[in-house]
Structure formats: structure tokens, C-alpha cells
């Protein structure tokens, strides 16, 4: 599975540092879920204003959120493009502090969460949530991306 990253945030954030982690996550999900390697998606890092506008305009929810995914598959027609996800940089920073773990862990969590939404996973129902969150934890733990403040199990 391939992806395109765009960084629309004017900050010191450099997504290139995390590109290797994103590749590891996408590859592991591809293997676990048997996703064709020709499928691809876009991930956009945006500011609070942009994500609130997207949330308001496309979801009728007028607030800042952390990640929004738009899956392009409708269940009948499968296209090479899985969809697009938008991650709010400032929410990554704030939530990492709030939850007491690293920026890397929060960023990778939201990337994984958004990608699973693109692949049809959801967490509206309790059973769906167990499956999706279980898979998220499995992926992140397998890659040693944990809730530890240093972002790994050993320190």
C-alpha cells in the first residue's frame, strides 16, 4: 500500500522524520489485512482552522477534531485510491501532552486510526470498537510504538 503525505502546517513539524514509521504501519496493515500493494491513500497534516472547516462542511460537526477520514470505496466499486485522511497537527501535540505519551505515539496512533477508517473499520458499535481498537493496539505494539512517554517499551 502506498501513500502521499502533504504537510500544510506552518510549524517546526517535519513529517519526513516520521515517514519511516508511517511506511511501517502501512506495510504491516497491508500484510495483516491482505491489502493490494497498488492501493494508495493521501494523508494531509493540517491546522486547527482547516480541520474544523472540513469537519463542519463535510460532517456537519463544527469543532476541531484530531483525524478525519474519507473512504472512497463504496463497498461495490473498488478504486486504487482508498481515500484521504486529515490529521490536525495541534491536536497531536495537545493530546500527546494530555495522555502523557510521546508526540510520535500520538501521531502514529492517529495515522493508524485514520487508515483503518479508510479500510472500512469503525467504532460506532461496541463490537466494531473492540475490533478496530484491538487492531490499532496490535499494530502499534508490534512496531513498539507504546504509550510510554518516550514512545517505546524500554524507556
From Swiss-Prot:
- For this protein, what is the EC number? 3.1.-.-
Protein name listed in UniProt: Endoribonuclease YbeY
List the cofactors.
Zn(2+)
The record's subcellular location field reads:
Cytoplasm
Which keywords does this Swiss-Prot/TrEMBL entry list? Cytoplasm, Endonuclease, Hydrolase, Metal-binding, Nuclease, Ribosome biogenesis, rRNA processing, Zinc
**Some GO term, biological process aspect, for this entry: which one?**
rRNA processing
List the NCBIfam families hit by this protein, alphabetically: rRNA maturation RNase YbeY (TIGR00043)
Amino acid at each position: 500500500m502506498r501513500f502521499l503525505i502533504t504537510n500544510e502546517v506552518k510549524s517546526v513539524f517535519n513529517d519526513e522524520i516520521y515517514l519511516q514509521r508511517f511506511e511501517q504501519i502501512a506495510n504491516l496493515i497491508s500484510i495483516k489485512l491482505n491489502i493490494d500493494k497498488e492501493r494508495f491513500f493521501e494523508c494531509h497534516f493540517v491546522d486547527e482552522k482547516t480541520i474544523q472547516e472540513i469537519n463542519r462542511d463535510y460532517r456537519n460537526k463544527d469543532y476541531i477534531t484530531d483525524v478525519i477520514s474519507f473512504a472512497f470505496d463504496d463497498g461495490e466499486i473498488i478504486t486504487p485510491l482508498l481515500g484521504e485522511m486529515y490529521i490536525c497537527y495541534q491536536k497531536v501535540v495537545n493530546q500527546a501532552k494530555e495522555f502523557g505519551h510521546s508526540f510520535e505515539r500520538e501521531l502514529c496512533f492517529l495515522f493508524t486510526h485514520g487508515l483503518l477508517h479508510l479500510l472500512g473499520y469503525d467504532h460506532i458499535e461496541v463490537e466494531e470498537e473492540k475490533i478496530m481498537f484491538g487492531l490499532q493496539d496490535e499494530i502499534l505494539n508490534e512496531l513498539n510504538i507504546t504509550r510510554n512517554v518516550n514512545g517505546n517499551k524500554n524507556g
